[in-house]
Amino acid sequence: SYLKGLDLLGFKYEDRTEPFQGASGATHPVLAEAVTQFQSLAYKELLPADGPVRTRVMGQPSKAKSDQAERVKEFMNYQLMCEMPEYEPEFDQMLFNLPLAGSAFKKVYYDQAIGRCVSKFVPAEDLVVPYSATSLDDADTIMHIIKMPANDMRKLQVQGFYKDVELGTPAYSEDDIKESKNDLEGVSTTNKDEIFTLVECHVELDLEGFEDLGADQLPTGIKMPYIVTVEETTQKVLSIRRNYDIEDPMKRRKDYFVHFKFLPGLGFYGFGLIHMIGGLSRTATAALRQLLDAGTLSNLPAGFKMRGIRVRDEAQPLQPGEFRDVDAPGGRLDDAFKILPFKEPSQTLLALMGQVVAAGQRFASIADLQVGDGNQSAAVGTTVALLERGSRVMSSIHKRLYSSMKKEFMLLSNVFATYLPPTYPYDVVGGEKQIKATDFDSRVDIIPVADPNIFSQTQRIQLAQTGLQMAMSNPGMHNLYSAYRSMYEALGVKDIDTLLPPVAEPAPMDPSVEHINVLSGKSIKAFPNQDHTAHMKAHLAFMGT
């Protein structure tokens, strides 16, 4: 289970007394390694320093649309990287939890308490949907479990966001998953922690007095989307809010949540590494502990020593380094000691553990990619094919994250379009820019800056290097400038123009210079303001020589 799988991370050392006191409690890091490798790769690719958003123009391009797309891109990157300080740590934490649980959620909404848009990470255990739901889109009920400090609750009541009712002393409780996570972190709650548990229900209701009316102005009986917030202990309703636009004739539900999946599961929730390689991690841990225990017993042998025929504490197992008294008749000193025949750690068990670990690493795509160790004379596409074959799992996961981030940016743009003033100026480094609320329309598509087909810098460099090799193999058919520029971009070089000056634009030349270029295999170009008749006469005369 997910709860037991958290122990396989090895964050907490287990003090064991079986099979002997002080037996190894080490945990093999194959699962922790896979999680951190994925988190570091995804974080770097999906959240670059310049911002995660790029835009593209929908429909026929024009200068107005291009300017609009540029404004949207700059503003959203500015908001995410500067004005929303919680975005980076929340995204970072989400990427660490995602490969463990298999599912993670982001909640995008306008926070009344701080007066701006936020995008918060929601663990899978804090979001509940009906059993029959297969996605957020077809779930008729979505319940979000919210832990809120008493002071924050009072602020929202005073602001009028929640109904000002007496809630009493909060009775905070934790589920098994939260307790396990706190145990791994080494933290605990106290009785002084005043935290309310709220249940925010995104439901469909047919409320009396607010019925859906048909063309004849009679109730249709159709349920409409609402958000109902209830305090868990007192079960008092704190708020009921409409969850659709008044102008929308279809009265469609507004979306607030984005589902990130590591791997598709059998139902609503996705599968994570605990589900897929948890058994391998447990097997590797058991083998590792047996090898360490065998080494301990071999290095610190135990046995018996003679002292009569009775054995003291014969019911207790021997400990490493222990020589227990044995009541026996006298004799030679060599005969007074008996070392138990502990074997060295099994090489077969060691090899088996290596195979188990390799299987887990291969599945999680964290095995070292020996790209530089291949045959340098191999075909150009061979290395790329090997790289792609060894990383199919990571590539598919990256595409799922790309799709979820695209939906997250769409929800963010909807919030900006709703709450921004008609024109919103903001300061940036070296100047001032502005955005319009009307810029967030269907003419601009907002997508992640990451390439869904490329998930690591290693892959990006290898593809650029392959393209450069092909261009150098036949320079006459390729643009070497573009090939070298792509290589520098893959390497992450910032000042490319200083290393690779742009190709100079062709300028008008006199006929004699054009003759020299033709002889050297260079192309020539005609310009509008040239004397074309004189040029043609000169070229014909040159061809006749």
Task: Show the residue positions of the predicted features.
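Intrinsically disordered or highly flexible coil/loop and linker segments, enriched in small
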Residues: 8, 52, 81-89, 100-104, ...
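Generic recognition of stable, solvent-exposed alpha-helical segments in well-folded globular domains
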Residues: 67, 71, 251, 255, ...
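C-terminal catalytic/scaffold cores in eukaryotic proteins
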Residues: 501-517, 522, 526, 530
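Surface-exposed loop-to-helix/strand elements on domain peripheries
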Residues: 28, 51-81, 258-275, 304-319, ...
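Extended, helix-rich architectural segments
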Residues: 1-245, 313-315, 345-348, 352-355, ...
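Composition- and surface-driven signal marking solvent-exposed, interaction-prone regions
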Residues: 221-226, 239-245, 253-259, 273, ...
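Catalytic nucleotidyl-transfer cores of nucleotide-processing enzymes
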Residues: 220-321
